[in-house]
UniProtKB/Swiss-Prot annotation:
Subcellular location(s) of the protein: Cytoplasm
EC code: 2.1.1.242
Biological role stated in the UniProt entry: Specifically methylates the guanosine in position 1516 of 16S rRNA.
Protein name stated in the entry: Ribosomal RNA small subunit methyltransferase J
Species classification: Bacteria, Pseudomonadati, Pseudomonadota, Gammaproteobacteria, Vibrionales
Binding site for S-adenosyl-L-methionine: R101, D102, E117, R118, S153, S154, D176
The reaction(s) this protein catalyses: guanosine(1516) in 16S rRNA + S-adenosyl-L-methionine = N(2)-methylguanosine(1516) in 16S rRNA + S-adenosyl-L-homocysteine + H(+)
Gene: rsmJ
Gene3D superfamilies: Vaccinia Virus protein VP39, YhiQ-like domain
Amino acid sequence: MQLQLICEDPSQQSHLDELAARWQLSHTDESDFALVLTAERLELRKVDEPKLGAIFVDLIGGAVGHRRKFGGGKGQAIAKAAGLNKGATPTVLDGTAGLGRDAFVLASLGCKVQMVERHPVVAALLDDGLARAKQDPEIGTWVSERMSLIHASSHDALDQLAQDREFVKPDVVYLDPMYPHPENKKKSALVKKEMRVFQSLVGADLDADGLLEPALALATKRVVVKRPDYANWLNEQKPSMAIETKKNRFDVYVKASMA
């Protein structure tokens, strides 16, 4: 993957070089996207649209921190979908981790969550945000214990894990594929910004239907698929049940009870 790689703090240039090597990123002046290492964090910027601002992973403050404190605990839809309301604390593989928000919610409720992000730039942002969260005095201990990023940013990462006999299969596989966003649907300013940048960088997950089969092969208890309320079932496969919110629904494919 080629994009602009910019280091604002010269003392951290070697860190940016390591990061680029890990995620197989290389510099080009031609790209409209810049991955910028500031003194505080790693950011993604759309060079030709500076008003959009920077995208970065913040698991400590902002909307994520607010949701951790006031988000409704195990009563919220994602927790019910993952089976936490049954008294279980399942292990989870988030197969489309993105900026890590849903994985963080599940981890904050006690789940051990392994994350896979197929796009290397997004994975690099997530890795950086996770490293900062692990240093935080309030949440660092349990983030370190419960959240990990699997360094697999290929499109067949789930297939590879399903076939790996050494890999301990999770109770739950969680999927939230990028879905084409209709213009007439209202979104918050932050989500709009992120969607615009991501969809121009990553594109919609046009192969998302292909994620369901390996997810079902990996999960021992259930697969949870987050969908916009207007979207079809993933791979046109009817779920065992659906948990609906105002704008989304969680389609749940049950393989075994959570007990």
